[in-house]
Amino acid sequence: MLDRRIFSDPNGNEVRWVVGSAWPYIYAVPHLGNLIGSLLSADVFTRYLKLKGYDVVFVTGSDEHGTPIEVEAIKLGIEPRQLTDRMHEIIVKLLKLWGIEPDNYTRTESEVHKWYVRDAFTKIYNNGYIFTKDDELPYCPRDKIFLPDRFVIGTCPYCGYPYARGDQCENCGRLLEPRMLINPKCAICGSTPEWRLTRHWYLDLRRLEDRIRSYIEGNSALPDNAKQMSLGILKEGLRPRAITRDNKWGIPAPFPGAEGKTIYVWFEAVLGYVSATIEYFRRLGREDDWRRFWFNKGTRVVFFIGKDNIPFHTIIFPALLMATGEDYVMPWTTSSTEYLIFEGKKFSKSQRVGIWADEAIALLPADYWRFYLIYNRPEQRDSNFTWDSFLDVVNSIMNDTVGNFIHRVLTLAKRRWGTVPGDVKMIEQDQEIYGKVLEILNTVEEDYERIMLKDAVSQSIEIARIGNKYLNERQPWRLSEVEFNSAIYMLMSIVKTLSITLAPVIPFSINELWRMMGYSNGLRWGDARKPIEQGLRLSEPKPLFRKISKEELNVMLKKLDEIRDIKDKGKYPWEQAYLPNP
């Protein structure tokens, strides 16, 4: 559980935020599990921070280097950059459709990123943390290429998982090397690899082990899954890790004698959080402002990642920052989710198990998916997406509890008022109800600050339930004018509070709600404690959401199959993405 003290600094430093989402590998469109584990959760938390008025930068981008892209480009007879240019464009469009708004969504092919990575590794090399070693590495005689770790698959020596990659077992999370695998195979063609001699450059993690252990043990903000996994790896002892590869597609290694080598994609991609911040402020014409974030002890750096990415963010990335010899602020915490599974199974494109970001947005508006995914976020255990649960959340909670309450209140207010009266006050009974809502608001705020986004949504729903209960029991339309005005004033104030607590989760709907309530500009978190402003001109209310029937679901599933039939016909990856026509 996250320590709330991250929202204040005991030494009086100004608190700033760098929010980083795991960079999507743009070999393909991300699925819902990818989104909830990183991009969507990071967007929701960033929106909360901005509502609070914090100085925050949300950075992420397209991870486009490495063997998978290189191999796919060879198969298609095109250059890797041709593939990544098109896929990057598609991801940018999808993020806009989903309402995911990084301050800088960049790419690992950006000139700033390539410059920063080479500069950082030059400093690390000059500081003596890098050495060379001649290794026998897996080489596929059929494909005639050296195989990066992740392109060797076999049985994990720790847990027996038969499809472990040569860099990490996705089942138990252990960091691996290809030689550790039992019965290794080439992931491209299935051939048994040969071992051939080649020279590579290594990061000597052993020399950084004590500092990394001290950093992790002393960090009360790390969630349990991240802390325990990291300490488990440290207990076994850190080993040097090869940071170069024989790929052509990547960032050229800057070390003397390393011509023809590129930086291993995992070691350059994590540095993207810094390079993306630099690039963001360069675009704003504020060249040195990035230092206010990365060299300020009051900065809170938080990563939104899946649990399989924990070691790269709690061990590798801090190690790289330490090895530069510069006084970087260390990452404060990770929000490392468990897995989202689909109808009890792992997401699988080939078996059509799951839903992908492009498919989802073709079926329903983004806020339906955003609400459900955050409501069902796998924060402490795996979550299971089922169509039945999706219908239940959309129909019973999103529409009936939240949407229906808002629409009933706005309809009453518009019908009797049109404009919020200037002399209206809450009677004592209504003040007590409003006070209970403000108590729940405190809990919602705590949940956001602990990055328990699922709990924040659940508590927001409780606010709507209080309003619905009041409407059903009090029946304001039967009251005297004074009591009616008090009731609607209180209920409109509850709607205002509710809208702010849900604004990070369903921004499209809340912006429309604010328009209907008469707000020309967006609200801030502090406004959630203030009653509705008098004099607001109300617009004609429209329902924010609608129910989805079983019959409509069947139509959606049929459309989903049709979309996938279209995607399957595409030769190129960008032809296998489904985007609405502009």
Curated annotation (Swiss-Prot):
One of its GO terms (cellular component) is cytosol. Disulfide bonds: none annotated. A motif ('HIGH' region) lies at residues 24-34. One of its GO terms (molecular function) is ATP binding. The keyword Zinc applies. Transmembrane segments: none annotated. Binds 1 zinc ion per subunit. It comes from the Archaea. NCBIfam families: metG. Belongs to the class-I aminoacyl-tRNA synthetase family. MetG type 1 subfamily. This is Methionine--tRNA ligase. It comes from Caldivirga maquilingensis (strain ATCC 700844 / DSM 13496 / JCM 10307 / IC-167).
